[in-house]
């Protein structure tokens, strides 16, 4: 069946399912896999870190690894009893690998927990309990720890992925910013569960004050954006070729040609998340307009909508050769202007809030 005979809804949905297995993605997935395989191999658990800027594919790698483990469990036996898949609406597949074991309850080999902003030491235990399906607000910290130990063992949890771990370092609610290291250390020592922390580069900062947790760390992997390289074996071109082949069009776009690859790299700074976003938006436009493929003009439209910039600041609108350094300077100038405007706006809002508070205080006096 060709793509042009399929429904618009099916084609648009397919766009969101793309995962490219690039060397960068494979290295990250390997870190998750090694961490998972080390479960109960030693006297104590270990932890690993996968860090990088937003858009390099950290969460995508984690989700891809979870899908791999889900396939391993599907149709297998545990203690002689079949395990069955769970409705993803009840237990989202991007937050856990969860199965139902008839007569025994849930089996969750992997959990993924999104660390909230302004988290606290106690809240980290609370978030873990909620992920285990045991939310509790009234329990003491000691009770929480006991329930966590019991549920991790009972549900067969082998590994927990903590995403957005930089929030632990950022949080002003933790008295000692490295208190979180003790949380992870306790979790690994008392339950022997494997831990993988995902976040921005500085998510590893809380290791600095905790030598024991540093000893328990197995790996620290930094994901980085694609470098600008037009060689066919380079990651950028490999990724763009894979993305081109996957798009739901019978006439595949040539995203990997030097002219378009350069513009995609300039627009995204090499971050896979941004490249995918621009191309996905353009692909959906092409489907809605009944066009036979994705064009540079469509990607330019997507870039303009996303960033609200004039044509001279849109790399897909520049005809002929494009000045790489010149365009980077234009982007930097635009960002500086936006940051200055945001700073002025925040200052104005704060001044108005102070004036409002003073008026209220004066009226109450």
Residue ranges: model-predicted function:
Residues 80-86, 110-119:
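A short hydrophobic beta-strand->loop->alpha-helix junction that borders the nucleotide-binding pocket
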Residues 10-29:
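Dynamic helix-loop-helix/coil hinge segments at AAA+ ATPase domain boundaries and subdomain interfaces
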Residues 29-41:
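Pre-Walker A adenine-sensing motif
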Residues 1-5, 13, 21, 55, ...:
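C-terminal alpha-helical "lid" subdomain
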Residues 44-64:
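Walker A/P-loop nucleotide-binding motif
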Residues 68-98, 134-136:
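Post-Walker A helix-loop "phosphate-sensing" segment adjacent to the P-loop in P-loop NTPases
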Residues 159, 167-173, 178-259:
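The catalytic "switch" region of P-loop NTPases
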Residues 116-150, 169-171, 175:
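Short glycine-rich substrate-engagement loop in P-loop NTPases that contacts/grips substrate
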